[in-house]
Amino acid sequence: MEGDKLKLIDYYNIENVLDFSYEGEDYSVTIVKVIVCPQCYSAIASRLSNMRDDYLIVDIGSKTTDVVYVRNGFPVESRSITIEKAMVKWIKEIQRDMKVQTGKDIPEHEVMKVLLKEESNLPVVYAELIRGMMRERIHSLELELAERGYDMEYINIIYVGGGALMARDHAGKYRSHTAYDCDLCANAKGYEFLAGQMMGKKVG
């Protein structure tokens, strides 16, 4: 883990000035200092001082699910993990399973419309199948977390980022100790907060 951090720091320090364009605007960024931390840790960084118990922070990303264990406001690196289950893999699996069950090739954007509760032209029965398949995957993820030693019945759980939408809408049961922070910019805001703290600036 420490070796990976050092490699990332060295990589991002190769060039300290980055020039790029985004949506028609030109930008020039000067890198003053490189900070490395788990992605979903940044999403809750501004709240750590108020977390006076055990928490599991779960960030379902595009390719991996990052999990940070927090005890009394401090991340416990030895109990923080990355799981190779996430949205890209799940969507492809759902497309494959829909092909098997219906004989139809369902485009990725139509699958996402159903999962995000947007208007879709898919038959209702197809939409129900897709939602059921996502419920199975969220359940499978939580089973794996339980198998890795996290007690999902009592520990405080916070799902963060875009994947929190999937967990909230497909978890299948209400739990008073589970929260969903569906802010798509949660990690970016957290990185800004952390950088500000380390540079001695007030952010927020």
Range-by-range predicted roles:
Residues 1-55, 77-88, 110-204:
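Nucleotide/phosphate-binding catalytic cleft detector across ATP-hydrolyzing
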Residues 18, 25-28, 50-51, 60-61, ...:
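Secondary-structure boundary elements
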Residues 47-76, 94:
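Gly/Thr-rich phosphate-binding beta-strand-loop-beta motif of the actin/hexokinase/Hsp70
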Residues 70-111:
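Glycine-rich phosphate-binding loop plus the immediately following alpha-helix
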